[in-house]
């Protein structure tokens, strides 16, 4: 198994990445396990944040690094919370928790007829900290935000993210179902394909 560092300590993301990357012979270690502090995320785009996190983790670990920047974008809110998804409630003086973030999103959407939203995931893989050709992949997953949470799986906004075609929220999907269709799975499929192209070039 080849070891790479994940520029995150999010247990939900770590579990998803390990499930999706283990078949490729990659062992994903969270940066906290290697004593690496979290990078700053000062940028206004998912791509810039993911690249900054990947370079930071790779530099401190001396390993290839994979970074994910992801979030949910509500159409009626101009794409908010977007890059601020993980700390959406904090920005309004609330606690940092999934429940608080979901509560703020539902509150902000009250009175809006358009409940459409999409998850975005941008993945950046660097072979080393100064990699001049980082591999960048992106996935989007479209659905609607519902007021009442449903399901016990997933994390983040999943209990409020309804997939109308399936009649389920992301939190009601099995891990296998989610890993087949999620924004992260789409981005990872792109990333794997690009990694293969680079290795065979």
Curated annotation (Swiss-Prot):
Q: What catalytic activity does the UniProt entry give for this protein?
A: XTP + H2O = XMP + diphosphate + H(+); dITP + H2O = dIMP + diphosphate + H(+); ITP + H2O = IMP + diphosphate + H(+)
Q: Name one GO molecular function term.
A: XTP diphosphatase activity
Residues bound to substrate: 8-13, 70, 155-158, 178, 183-184
What's its EC?
Answer: 3.6.1.66
Q: Name one Pfam family in it.
A: Ham1p_like
Q: Which InterPro entries match?
A: dITP/XTP_pyrophosphatase (IPR020922), ITPase-like_fam (IPR029001), RdgB/HAM1 (IPR002637)
Cofactor(s) the record lists: Mg(2+)
Please indicate if the UniProt record lists Thylakoid as a keyword: no
**Active-site residues, as the UniProt record annotates them:** 69 (proton acceptor)
Q: How is the cofactor bound?
A: Binds 1 Mg(2+) ion per subunit.
- GO-annotated cellular components: cytosol
Q: What keywords does the record list, in alphabetical order?
A: Hydrolase, Magnesium, Metal-binding, Nucleotide metabolism, Nucleotide-binding
Is the keyword Transferase in the record? Answer: no
EC class (word): hydrolase
Q: Name one GO biological process term.
A: nucleotide metabolic process
Cited Gene3D superfamilies: 3.90.950.10
Which amino acid positions bind Mg(2+), per UniProt?
Answer: 40, 69
Q: Which domain of life is it from?
A: Bacteria
Q: What does this protein do?
A: Pyrophosphatase that catalyzes the hydrolysis of nucleoside triphosphates to their monophosphate derivatives, with a high preference for the non-canonical purine nucleotides XTP (xanthosine triphosphate), dITP (deoxyinosine triphosphate) and ITP. Seems to function as a house-cleaning enzyme that removes non-canonical purine nucleotides from the nucleotide pool, thus preventing their incorporation into DNA/RNA and avoiding chromosomal lesions.
Q: Which family does it belong to?
A: Belongs to the HAM1 NTPase family.
The record's note on quaternary structure and interaction partners says:
Homodimer.
What protein does this entry describe?
Answer: dITP/XTP pyrophosphatase
């Amino acid at each position: 198994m080849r070891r790479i560092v994940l520029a995150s300590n999010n247990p939900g993301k770590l579990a998803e990445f390990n499930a999706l990357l283990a078949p490729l012979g990659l062992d994903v270690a969270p940066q906290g396990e290697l004593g690496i502090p979290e990078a700053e995320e000062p940028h206004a785009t998912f791509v810039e944040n993911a690249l900054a996190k990947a370079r930071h983790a790779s530099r401190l670990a001396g390993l290839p690094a994979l970074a994910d920047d992801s979030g949910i974008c509500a159409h009626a809110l101009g794409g908010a919370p977007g890059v601020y998804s993980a700390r959406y409630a904090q920005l309004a003086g609330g606690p940092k928790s999934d429940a608080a973030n979901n509560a703020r999103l539902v509150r902000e959407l009250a009175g809006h007829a358009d409940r459409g939203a999409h998850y975005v995931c941008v993945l950046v893989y660097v072979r080393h900290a100064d990699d001049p050709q980082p591999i960048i992949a992106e996935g989007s997953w479209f659905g609607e935000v519902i007021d009442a949470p449903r399901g016990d799986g997933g994390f983040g906004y999943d209990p409020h993210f309804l997939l109308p075609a399936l009649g389920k929220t992301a939190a009601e999907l099995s891990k296998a179902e989610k890993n087949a269709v999620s924004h992260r799975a789409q981005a990872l499929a792109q990333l794997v394909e690009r990694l293969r192209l680079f290795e065979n070039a």
